[in-house]
């Protein structure tokens, strides 16, 4: 909804209601207990459909035996007796070794916690957006915005896995929430030949969802609400049409970021307060200059040069999973002809053949990088029918 208080001052209010449920279904198990096309016993793995059905019961899956279902409310001693009757050998081994055919007390306690696993990760609520805008003249607009956002929660396949320091992989993640405060402007200056749009912003991130790979806890990826964080920044774009040289246009854009993890929410040194967020270069900018002129044949010709720069950043907030994404600078040029019905453009992207890193990770203790395309030369043709 929009409200005009005066011809210069207005307000806009928006809201969106969400009711989201995220579920997991299926199985992740071995085939040892399924000889000769027998029914799947869901053994030596996780019966995900059974775990996340919310009925408060769960069948033991670390043995080929036809095990009884355990119900919520059962005590540890009662569960221990059931396991001992089912497979006394494995229970006895669990007192001394950690092996697939050893049932430890920690594993039994994990099954008891799994009895309380939810049916779905549910989230509902309303997010809001408020904007006030003030236009003192036809050439200038100021605005202030408050907005909210969130991502739905998740379910973890290895929920309940135990780590050092009493850490336990959660069965269900909470939403992570964003609150944004922004002050922006749109301005035409120098007789309309210079345009400068931009904004300054502050963002609070609560309960940031993060995917983790830590074999000391479990040999699977899992997610958790790992940290709270803050983002401060300024961004803008500029377009200039010099009056002294008709046909020339110069443009560019920039982004300055200061990101910080303010609180860690999981008991691990793999998340560090004060570190920056992932994929958040402190400085990014691009620029271009294009010159157009009319030929005697009636065609429009142009030449253009452009460049882009990105500062270095981290690929993750989890220190054991992250790598440094190097800074890079890329250049390109184009030249072309156009008429009312067709156009042809010769282009060279990544003129200096920069090995620009667009993404990187260090998951599984192996460096993986995604690079920009190498120097690319081509011709683009377009026709209007």
Regions found by a protein language model. Name each.
Residues 1, 126-132, 169, 179-183, ...:
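Hydrophobic, lipid-facing positions within transmembrane beta-strands of outer-membrane proteins
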Residues 2-4, 8-14, 22, 131, ...:
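Membrane-spanning beta-strand positions in outer-membrane beta-barrel proteins
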Residues 3, 17, 124, 132-135, ...:
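Residue-level signature of outer-membrane beta-barrel architecture
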Residues 7-11, 193-205, 209, 222-318, ...:
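Gram-negative outer-membrane beta-barrel transporters
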Residues 21, 118-126, 174-177, 226-232, ...:
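Short sequence motifs at beta-strands and strand-loop junctions characteristic
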Residues 23-120, 156-172, 210-223, 261-275, ...:
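Solvent-exposed loop segments that connect transmembrane elements
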Residues 133-159, 172-239, 255, 260-262, ...:
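Membrane-embedded beta-barrel scaffold of Gram-negative outer-membrane proteins
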Residues 204, 307-318, 336-385:
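C-terminal beta-signal and adjacent terminal beta-strands/loops
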């Amino acid at each position: 909804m929009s409200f005009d208080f005066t011809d210069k001052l207005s307000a806009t209010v928006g809201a969106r209601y969400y009711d989201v449920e995220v579920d997991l279904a299926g199985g992740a198990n071995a085939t040892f207990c399924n000889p000769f096309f027998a029914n799947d016993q869901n053994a030596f793995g996780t019966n995900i459909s059974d775990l996340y059905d919310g009925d408060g019961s769960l069948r033991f899956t670390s043995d080929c035996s036809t095990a009884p279902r355990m119900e919520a409310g059962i005590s540890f001693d009662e569960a221990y007796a059931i396991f001992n009757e089912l497979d006394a050998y494995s229970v006895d081994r669990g007192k001394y070794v950690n092996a697939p055919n050893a049932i430890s007390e920690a594993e039994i306690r994990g099954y008891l916690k799994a009895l309380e696993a939810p049916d779905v990760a549910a989230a509902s609520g309303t997010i809001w957006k408020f904007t006030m805008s003030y236009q003192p003249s036809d050439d200038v607009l100021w605005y202030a915005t408050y907005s909210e956002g969130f991502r739905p929660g998740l379910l973890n396949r290895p929920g309940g896995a135990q780590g050092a320091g009493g850490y336990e992989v959660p069965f269900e993640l909470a939403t992570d929430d964003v609150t944004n405060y922004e002050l922006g402007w749109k301005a035409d200056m120098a007789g309309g030949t210079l345009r400068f749009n931009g904004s300054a912003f502050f963002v609070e991130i609560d309960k940031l969802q993060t995917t983790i790979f830590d074999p000391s806890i479990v040999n699977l990826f899992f997610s958790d609400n790992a940290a709270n964080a803050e983002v401060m920044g300024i961004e803008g774009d500029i377009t200039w049409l010099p009056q002294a040289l008709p046909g020339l246009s110069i443009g560019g854009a920039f982004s300055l970021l200061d990101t910080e993890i303010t609180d860690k929410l999981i008991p691990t040194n793999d998340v560090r307060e004060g570190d920056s967020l992932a994929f958040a270069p402190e400085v990014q900018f691009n620029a271009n200059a294009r010159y157009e002129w009319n030929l005697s044949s009636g065609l429009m010709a142009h030449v253009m040069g452009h460049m882009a720069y990105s500062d270095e950043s981290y690929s993750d907030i989890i220190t054991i999973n992250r790598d440094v994404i190097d800074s890079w600078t890329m250049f390109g040029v184009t030249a072309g002809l156009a008429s009312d019905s067709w156009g042809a453009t010769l282009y060279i992207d990544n003129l200096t053949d920069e090995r620009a890193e667009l993404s990187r990770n260090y998951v599984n203790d192996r460096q993986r990088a995604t690079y920009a395309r190498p120097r690319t030369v081509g011709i683009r043709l377009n026709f209007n029918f």
